[in-house]
């Protein structure tokens, strides 16, 4: 065994040790949240060793395989793939989760089931690492289903609340639709290639692979909340804030994009799939950015920003730039986790208040949290020399030099400016203007379990983009030199968005609206998607099934067959019997006339 395999196994052993301890009596004698946080911290430190060696030696990839089981002619192996994507994402995920775990010990300290909560978060991380390091479809599926199940348990953590249960069910049901696509791809690869190993699938690449690629795209659409299967993502904010931070930064929602990044050799020459990804991502990033503009729940604004960034990653994949999409996954994890943790700190301090209209002037009473919130918001918009800039600027340069589907690319640029608008809206309502919260709230942000994780992620939000961007493989952006106005597009769009948002916020504070604006209603009600998909469609289908099953059953089977058939039979028999009036002479005369007519006809026939 080499250093890479040893490191991966050691990371998994360290992460599994808290799970095993939680099943024994040892959990009663240790500080379980602290133990788990320490395990993840050491796992992160260990993951740096293979990461640095990988970059130093300019390695491409390395596969570690153990035989598992043979089914008929197909051999299943347990194989781990150590390449640029898996080894870098492992370090990023461990660093972010280390901070979230420490934050959870502060945020959930009063919860009686905090040990189980920490265990669920650890399992969430483990299943995501299984997904990223897997080298065959079966292991990918284990990690894929694992993150889905753990998200269901964590979103519905406060199971006494109806909204939390509904949100958890939404997440699992929308992901079931995506799982259908994943299973379709697995079945196709099994039948046509007789293998689930990624190497064999990539080497036997042919042009007749539209069905599995559409299956993988459906899977990514469900998991990464692309347009059409997106309503579960804002609903998932019903879970605790640490769950939202982990879910949106480095686990669940980026799993779909990571899946398409992993299979990018199959999509490179398939123009239909590339165009579909481009248009789907553009539609997602614009729609969710519009929805974020008028939301008032701070967590939902950040959730919609995640969905918008996922759409941007899908656009990048549609432009055939998988390394840029992966770079944005890694940079996005730092500031998105920090944004959620800052919002959690504010919500916790303001007695569980999430409405940004009831905040204001947090800067003076929570200077550290508000400063980090501003840094995270600026990084999200792609402000120069923060982490988000290094990925977003490259993506916008790629958009400007790309020669496919100008409408989709223009929509993406508009959505990017909207990112600056809703980020400025958060900064304006939370940190600026006058205080709008009750004066008797006690605010304390001096706990090291709160300060240290946000501090680490703040450093990551400033410096991580520079470090990661200089270690990604060269991308295939066609034009390496461009005019200054194209080069500064990202900055111009962000600054314009900030200025427009600031002006609009200042104006709306002075206006009095008599009635709701229909355009605002479209954005506030999330494009009427929840109403249509969750209310009208089920109601119509249930009414149709009710009428089909009950009305037709009642009309045909219960009326025509049993009661009405009996009554009809009795009526006919009664009619037959009541026709006999007892007129014997009349009956004999009729009989005689008939006999005479028959004899006449018979005699005519004989002649």
Curated annotation (Swiss-Prot):
It is a multi-pass membrane protein. It catalyses: a ubiquinone + NADH + 5 H(+)(in) = a ubiquinol + NAD(+) + 4 H(+)(out). InterPro entries: NADH_DH_su5_C, NADHpl_OxRdtase_5_subgr, ND/Mrp_TM, NU5C-like, Proton_antipo_N. It holds the Pfam family Proton_antipo_N. GO terms for molecular function: NADH dehydrogenase (ubiquinone) activity. One of its GO terms (cellular component) is mitochondrial inner membrane. One of its GO terms (biological process) is mitochondrial respiratory chain complex I assembly. This is NADH-ubiquinone oxidoreductase chain 5. It comes from Mus musculus. The lineage of its organism: Eukaryota, Metazoa, Chordata, Craniata, Vertebrata.
């Amino acid at each position: 065994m080499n250093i890479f395999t040893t490191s991966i196994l050691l990371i998994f052993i360290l992460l599994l040790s808290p799970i095993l301890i939680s099943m024994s009596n040892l959990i009663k004698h240790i500080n379980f949240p602290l133990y788990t946080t320490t395990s993840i911290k050491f796992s992160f430190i260990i993951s740096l060793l293979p990461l640095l060696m990988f970059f130093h030696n300019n390695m491409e990839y390395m596969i570690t395989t153990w035989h598992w089981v043979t089914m008929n002619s197909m051999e299943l192996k347990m194989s781990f793939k150590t390449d640029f994507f898996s080894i870098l994402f492992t370090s990023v995920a461990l660093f972010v989760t280390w901070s979230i775990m420490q934050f959870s010990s502060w945020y959930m300290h009063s919860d009686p089931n905090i040990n189980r909560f920490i265990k669920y978060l650890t399992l969430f991380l483990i299943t995501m690492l299984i997904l990223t390091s897997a080298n065959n479809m079966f292991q990918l599926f284990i990690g894929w289903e694992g993150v889905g199940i753990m998200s269901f348990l964590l979103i519905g953590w406060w199971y006494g609340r109806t909204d939390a249960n509904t949100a958890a069910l939404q997440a699992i049901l929308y992901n079931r639709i995506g799982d259908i696509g994943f299973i379709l791809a697995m079945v196709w690869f099994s039948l046509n290639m007789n293998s689930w190993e990624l190497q064999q699938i990539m080497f036997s690449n042919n042009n007749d692979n539209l069905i599995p690629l559409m299956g993988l795209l459906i899977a990514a659409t469900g998991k990464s909340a692309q347009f059409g299967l997106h309503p579960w993502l804002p609903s998932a904010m019903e879970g605790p804030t640490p769950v939202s931070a982990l879910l949106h930064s480095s686990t669940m929602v980026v799993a779909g994009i990571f899946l398409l990044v992993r299979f990018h050799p199959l999509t490179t020459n398939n123009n239909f799939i590339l165009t579909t990804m481009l248009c789907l991502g553009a539609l997602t990033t614009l729609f969710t950015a519009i929805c974020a503009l008028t939301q008032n729940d701070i967590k939902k604004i950040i959730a919609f920003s995640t969905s918008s960034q996922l759409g941007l990653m899908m656009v990048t994949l549609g432009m055939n730039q998988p390394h840029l999409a992966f770079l944005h996954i890694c940079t996005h994890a730092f500031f998105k986790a920090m944004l959620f943790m800052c919002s959690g700190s504010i919500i916790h301090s303001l007695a569980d208040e999430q409405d940004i209209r009831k905040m204001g002037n947090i800067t003076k009473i929570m200077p550290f949290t508000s400063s980090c919130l501003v840094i995270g918001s600026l990084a999200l918009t792609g402000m120069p020399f923060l982490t988000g800039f290094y990925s977003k600027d490259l993506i916008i340069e790629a958009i400007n030099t790309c020669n496919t589907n100008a409408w989709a690319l223009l929509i993406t640029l508009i959505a990017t400016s909207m990112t600056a608008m809703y980020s400025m809206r958060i900064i304006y309502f939370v940190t600026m203007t006058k205080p709008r919260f009750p004066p008797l709230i006690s605010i304390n942000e001096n706990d090291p379990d709160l300060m240290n994780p946000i501090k680490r992620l703040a450093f990551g939000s400033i410096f991580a983009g520079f470090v990661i961007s200089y270690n990604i493989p060269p991308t295939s952006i066609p034009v390496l030199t461009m005019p200054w106005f194209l080069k500064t597009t990202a900055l111009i769009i962000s600054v314009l968005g900030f200025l427009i948002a600031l002006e609009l916020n200042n104006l709306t504070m002075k206006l009095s609206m008599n009635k709701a604006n229909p355009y605002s209603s479209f954005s506030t009600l999330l494009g009427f998607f929840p109403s249509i998909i969750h209310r009208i469609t089920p109601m119509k289908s249930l009414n149709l099934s009710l009428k089909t099953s009950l009305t037709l059953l009642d009309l045909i089977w219960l009326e025509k067959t049993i009661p009405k058939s009996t009554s009809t039979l009795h009526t006919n028999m009664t009619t037959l019997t009541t026709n006999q009036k007892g007129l014997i002479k009349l009956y004999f005369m009729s009989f005689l006339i008939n006999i005479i007519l028959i004899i006449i006809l018979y005699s005519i026939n004989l002649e």
